[in-house]
Amino acid sequence: MNDQQKKEQYSGVRDQEIRTALDQHWAASDANDIETEHRLYHEDAVLEYPQSGERTRGRRNIQNQRASQPSKKRFTIRRIIGGGDLWITEFILTYDGKPSYTVSIMEFRGDKIVRETQYFADPFVAPAWRAQWVERDSG
């Protein structure tokens, strides 16, 4: 096996390890297992919410901020895509029964998240004028 093949094999194994860790992260998030949910974050991780202009620095601050959320939340994963150091998760985050369509962009260093950026959007009613060109998604 040449160096390029070894690198590709390592990359594939690492990607699978990160994907497995992300599956565990989102399952822990949905189960409100705050400790397991945040194991994947680097000590100096940064979490950004561009829509509100907030930035949280440090794994403990991220964990404490999320643990203090007063609403009951649920996570429904639509898809996870990525490779290498960049991973994206699309999910529906439901707070007290109200859905928010969410995109999480995670940047990794090694096997830990060093930066996460999340965007949130409320559902909206599809306009009638587009009906002839679109399919309706039940989710």
What role is predicted for each listed range?
Residues 1-43, 132-139:
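Short, low-complexity N-terminal intrinsically disordered segments enriched in polar/charged residues
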Residues 2-13, 63-139:
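A beta-strand edge to alpha-helix "cap/lid" segment located at domain peripheries
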Residues 18, 22, 59-62, 99:
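A structural signal for well-ordered alpha-helical scaffolds and beta->alpha junctions
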Residues 21, 41, 52, 94, ...:
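Short amphipathic alpha-helical "recognition" segments used for binding
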Residues 25-28, 47-48, 90:
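Alpha-helix C-capping/helix-to-loop hinge sites
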Residues 30, 45, 95-97:
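Flexible interhelical turns and helix-capping residues at alpha-helix boundaries
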Residues 34-84:
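A solvent-exposed, acidic/Ser-Thr-rich amphipathic alpha-helical stretch
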